[in-house]
From Swiss-Prot:
GO cellular component: host cell cytoplasm; host cell plasma membrane; membrane; virion component
Name listed for the protein in its UniProt record: Virion infectivity factor
Region (SOCS box-like): 151-180
GO biological process assignments: viral life cycle
Site feature: Cleavage in virion (by viral protease): 150-151
Motif BC-box-like motif location, chain numbering: 144-153
UniProt function note: Counteracts the innate antiviral activity of host APOBEC3F and APOBEC3G by promoting their ubiquitination and degradation. Acts as a substrate recognition component of an E3 ubiquitin-protein ligase complex: mechanistically, Vif hijacks a host cullin-5-RING E3 ubiquitin-protein ligase complex (ECS complex) and the transcription coactivator CBFB/CBF-beta to form an active E3 ubiquitin-protein ligase complex that targets APOBEC3G and APOBEC3F for polyubiquitination, leading to their degradation by the proteasome.
Stretch list, region RNA-binding: 75-114
Compartmental location: Host cytoplasm; Host cell membrane; Virion
Residues with the Phosphothreonine modification: 96
Modification note: Processed in virion by the viral protease.
Length: 192
């Protein structure tokens, strides 16, 4: 019998981001109680030797499963050290891979307070308006002038600790171009 291979998308991350993700998930499960119904599965509760943890997040009838791995083949950079994350959307027997932005949007829609464009209608009708959105990155599109005015009027408030974000977990800050503040460099070399 031949080997059967299963291919999955695994996002390479460093282990400190995985530790931060796990601690944020546990905080919102046990302290803030915003992550109701979430299930955290430890590495010793699974039979797969490369799985370090799993987080099962109910989203309607389906659920998002974020699996963190260790002991994978070493990544492109030395700090990756073979750690990774896969994100899966499951509904009964159907499973599919999900990118981090989509996972964050699904979590945001089901679990955390949101100040959305419907707030304009609520304010016009004289109903109470939710004062903030706990995941503003979920609203990347440019809002209407009324929406922008209402958000400026309500004001933003920093959340401590931040909400668990799959996008933040998988972002690659190491390979981004580093900008030095206040450093012009050699004027001959930079074209001035």
């Amino acid at each position: 019998m031949e080997n059967r291979w299963q291919v999955m998308v695994v996002w390479q991350v460093d282990r400190m981001k995985i530790r931060k993700w796990n601690s944020l998930v546990k905080h919102h499960m046990y302290v803030s109680k915003k992550a109701k119904g979430w299930y955290y599965r430890h590495h010793y509760e699974t039979h797969h030797p490369k799985i370090s943890s799993e987080v099962h997040i109910p989203v309607g009838q389906a659920r998002l499963v974020t699996v963190t791995y260790w002991g994978l083949t070493t990544g492109e950079q030395s700090w990756h050290l073979g750690h990774g994350v896969s994100i899966e959307w499951r509904l009964r027997k159907y499973k599919t891979q999900v990118d981090p932005e989509m996972a964050d949007k699904l979590i945001h829609l089901h679990y955390f307070d949101c100040f959305t464009a419907s707030a304009i209608r609520q304010a016009v009708l004289g109903r109470p308006v939710l004062p903030r959105c706990e995941y503003p990155a979920g609203h990347k599109q440019v809002g209407t002038l009324q929406y922008l005015a209402l958000t400026a009027w309500v004001g933003a408030k920093k959340r401590k600790p931040p909400l668990p974000s799959v996008t933040k977990l998988t972002e690659d800050r190491w390979n981004e171009h580093q900008k030095m503040q206040g450093h012009r460099g050699n004027p001959i070399m930079n074209g001035h």
